[in-house]
Every structure is written in structure tokens, then in C-alpha cells.
């Protein structure tokens, strides 16, 4: 399942994440499809005082961004998550509106909504180059020919960065092993 946490590394990312949760709910109604989204919350625990201090800073940041957050002591952690082995746990935070969704469901909802607004989606059509004319995107060159367009959505995952570099656009994505 895809995790949909609200708190990001910056206030801008947090706003985008919160917006996405609302967008997915709205698009489910619009498209009649399901994202499989469940807002069951997220708990992060700390096993050291230092980690708990870090979680408290994150909780403060969350509150400043209007993200609902609850700081948890051991007792409250056990209430929320009874199977937790809490002997070595100092505390934690709970974000009740964080969610999870089915990545395939989200993709299908976004694709249908885009098509309803007039977008065309070309699957199995690798883009070789983004074409620029008069400092604007004019199309894409693919292995099946040129497609004229005003807008391009780069949905190439970690390869978006390379594609962006070719047209002097910074896409701050980096592969990360996890």
C-alpha cells in the first residue's frame, strides 16, 4: 500500500501532501473509482530520549502546518496499539489523518480524472526528448513519432530528473535505497 503521510520536509511539501489527501477524496466522487484510501493514522515511536526530542520538533512543525498530531506517552501508545512491545519505548507521535492508499487505484483515479478534463495518456510510449519552441514546450519525441502538446506530465519516477536536465528544469528527485 502507498503511505500518505501529511508532514513533509518543508511547509510547501506538507501543503501538497494535505492537498493530495483532499484531492483523492474529491476525485473518487468525480470518477466513481476508488483509490483504496483509508485514513487510519500513523504512529511513530521513539526508543531514545534524543529520538523523542526529534519527534517533538516534528509535532511542533505539524501543528504549525495545521496537521493534526498527538504526542503520545507509553500509556496512550498502548491504548492505540495494544500489541506494541513498549518496554524500551520512550514515547511517540500520532497523526490520525495520515492514510494509506492502493497505488494502482490512485493511478486509475488520476488517469480517469485527467481524461475527463481532456488529457490524452500514451502508455508504452517512451519519450526520447521534450521539444521546445520559443522557450515553451511544443511536444515530445517518442519512439512512435512526435506528439504535439502544450503541457507534459513527467511520470517517469527517478528518470524524471534526467529528462528535466535536458531542458534545464530541475526535478529534485534522487534514487534512494530503502
Language model features with spans:
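Short, glycine/charged-enriched secondary-structure capping and boundary segments
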Residues: 1-2, 18-19, 58-60, 85, ...
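Solvent-exposed alpha-helices and their adjacent loops that cap or buttress functional pockets
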Residues: 35-38, 86-87, 144-146, 155, ...
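Residue-level detector of anion-binding/catalytic polar loops
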Residues: 68, 120, 170
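Dinucleotide-binding Rossmann-like beta1-alpha1 core, especially the glycine-rich loop
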Residues: 2-80
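Helix-loop-beta segment of a Rossmann-like dinucleotide-binding subdomain
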Residues: 33-44, 58, 65, 78-117, ...
Amino acid at each position: 500500500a502507498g503511505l500518505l503521510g501529511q508532514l513533509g520536509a518543508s511547509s510547501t511539501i506538507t501543503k501538497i501532501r494535505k492537498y493530495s489527501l483532499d484531492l483523492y477524496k474529491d476525485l473518487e466522487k468525480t470518477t466513481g473509482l476508488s483509490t483504496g484510501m483509508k485514513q487510519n493514522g500513523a504512529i511513530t515511536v521513539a526508543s531514545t530520549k534524543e529520538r523523542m526530542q526529534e519527534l517533538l520538533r516534528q509535532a511542533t512543525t505539524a501543528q504549525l502546518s495545521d496537521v493534526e498530531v498527538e504526542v503520545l506517552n507509553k500509556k496512550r501508545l498502548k491504548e492505540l496499539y495494544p500489541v506494541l512491545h513498549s518496554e524500551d519505548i520512550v514515547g511517540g507521535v500520532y497523526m490520525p489523518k495520515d492514510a494509506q492508499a492502493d497505488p494502482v487505484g490512485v493511478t486509475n483515479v488520476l488517469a480517469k480524472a485527467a481524461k475527463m478534463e481532456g488529457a490524452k495518456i500514451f502508455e508504452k510510449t517512451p519519450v526520447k526528448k521534450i521539444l521546445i519552441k520559443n522557450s515553451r514546450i511544443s511536444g515530445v519525441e517518442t519512439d512512435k513519432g512526435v506528439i504535439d502538446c502544450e503541457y507534459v506530465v513527467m511520470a517517469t519516477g527517478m528518470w524524471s530528473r534526467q529528462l528535466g536536465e535536458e531542458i534545464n528544469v530541475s526535478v529534485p528527485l534522487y534514487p534512494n535505497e530503502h
